[in-house]
Swiss-Prot record:
It is found in: Cytoplasm. GO terms for biological process: peptide biosynthetic process. Keywords: Cytoplasm, Elongation factor, Protein biosynthesis. Disulfide bonds: none annotated. Belongs to the elongation factor P family. This is Elongation factor P. Its main location: cytoplasm. The keyword Ion transport does not apply. The gene is efp. It comes from the Bacteria. One of its GO terms (molecular function) is translation elongation factor activity. It comes from Ehrlichia chaffeensis (strain ATCC CRL-10679 / Arkansas). The keyword Protein biosynthesis applies.
């Protein structure tokens, strides 16, 4: 489907130079001289290579027509995971590599969104927000003030280390923002 360059958004899948690219980041630029353009950071879905491309804001781009389906994670077996379609209950076994570094968030019953192009899986996404338990944290030095650091490093149940506020302690459940692997808030309830 053809669209204008100014319509590019993160998450779109584009057909460009005979390959499929996932748009990761977009920056609109209006130079003092000449026409506006879009600087897009894209990831080649076949090779995983990152690429930067400029598109004219009023130029045409070709957006790939993709289908998305939600699947529930059932279990992992080494480098493979088994997931189940939420409506048809069909089970698939796919490579964990399709999730890239986000496979660290796999836990029982998490919902994974698979992206299909011409019936073939081209990418997968975990939810933007995942709740995890803090296993251990660094000790806070008494007298530490806001002017120094208001954060400390915490180890989560999935063996991931992230920065959390100093009031977080082992046993707390926190919400992690998965696109940038950062602390979002303490889990409610």
């Amino acid at each position: 489907m053809a669209e204008r360059g100014s319509d590019i958004r993160p998450g779109h899948v584009l057909e460009h130079n005979n390959a499929l690219y996932l748009v990761v980041k977009v920056m609109h630029t209006q130079p003092g001289k000449g026409g506006a353009y879009i600087q897009a950071e894209m990831k080649n879905l076949k090779t995983g290579a990152k690429q930067y491309e400029r598109f004219r804001a009023d130029g045409d781009i070709k957006r790939a027509i993709v289908d998305e389906s939600d699947y529930q994670y059932i279990y992992g077996d080494g480098s493979m995971i088994t997931i189940m379609h939420l409506k048809t209950y069909e089970q698939l076994t796919i490579s964990k590599d399709i999730l890239g570094d986000k496979s660290i968030y796999l836990q029982d019953n998490i919902i994974i969104t698979l992206v299909f192009y011409n019936g073939e899986i081209i990418s997968a996404k975990v939810p933007d927000y995942v709740t995890l338990q803090v296993v251990e944290t660094e000790a806070v030095i008494k007298g530490q003030t806001v002017s120094s650091s208001a954060y400390k490093v915490a180890m989560l149940e999935n063996n991931q280390r992230i920065s959390v506020p100093t009031f977080i302690k082992p046993g707390d459940r926190i919400v992690v923002y998965t696109p940038d692997d950062s602390y979002y808030e303490r889990a409610k309830g």
